[in-house]
Amino acid sequence: MKSKYLDNTEVKKLRSAMSCEEWLPLWVSLETGLRVGDVVKLRPRDVQKDGIHYVAEKTGKKGIAAIPQILRRELSERKGKYIFPSYRSADKHLSRQAVWQRIKRAGKRAGVDLEGLSPHAMRKAFAVELYRKKGFKVVQEALQHTNTATTEIYSFADWDTGENANLPLRRRDLRLVVRMVLEALGEAYKMPKESQKKGKEE
């Protein structure tokens, strides 16, 4: 079973099939883990010396996402109401759907498996790489997840081989398999106590 996320090679292929303008919002998501819906709403004032200041639309949580200097310079040069203005009006931001169309077109040109493509593609790639390097807790904090089950999804990026797994393999496999089977049967999956916190996440 192959996880639905883009590996480094696929990300590079996708980048090569896009213009700089098309790639920029995805680059932000890849570097920060921000949802595309939050990226497209960014304004020039949100880009500061310590990173991107944002409020997550789904949770209402405030955060500061660190970004490399080269990306900060690129974003700082953007003028207008929004960093990513709509094609139709500079007073409106680019839509999530427009970004999704860009991803699909670039994916087809690059020959990337469309199964791994979605508006969340860069957020997933960010989470998987961060999980491999820093572990579960760091990813949970970076993505602002209150429900540990949501973060655990990213720990299964290599669940077919168990490579780079920081959680006990038996526990990880069992939990995901049970969840998948019950959801397929239309049954609710009752998470362990530490995972029952409510929150709007993805």
Pin down the residues of each PLM region:
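The alpha-helix within a helix-turn-helix
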Residues: 29, 40, 140
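Short coil/turn motifs that cap or connect alpha-helices
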Residues: 35, 113, 146-149
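C-terminal catalytic core of Y-nucleophile DNA break-rejoin enzymes
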Residues: 57-76, 81-105
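DNA/chromatin major-groove-contacting recognition/catalytic segments
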Residues: 1, 5, 66-70, 156-193, ...
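Short, polar N-cap/turn motifs at the start of nucleic acid-interacting alpha helices
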Residues: 46-49, 135-155, 160
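Short, basic (Lys/Arg/His-rich) helix/loop patches that form interaction surfaces
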Residues: 16-18, 101-141
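Basic, Lys/Arg- and aromatic-enriched nucleic-acid-binding interface segment
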Residues: 4-36
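Conserved tyrosine-mediated DNA breakage-rejoining catalytic core shared by Y-recombinases
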Residues: 8, 32, 41-74
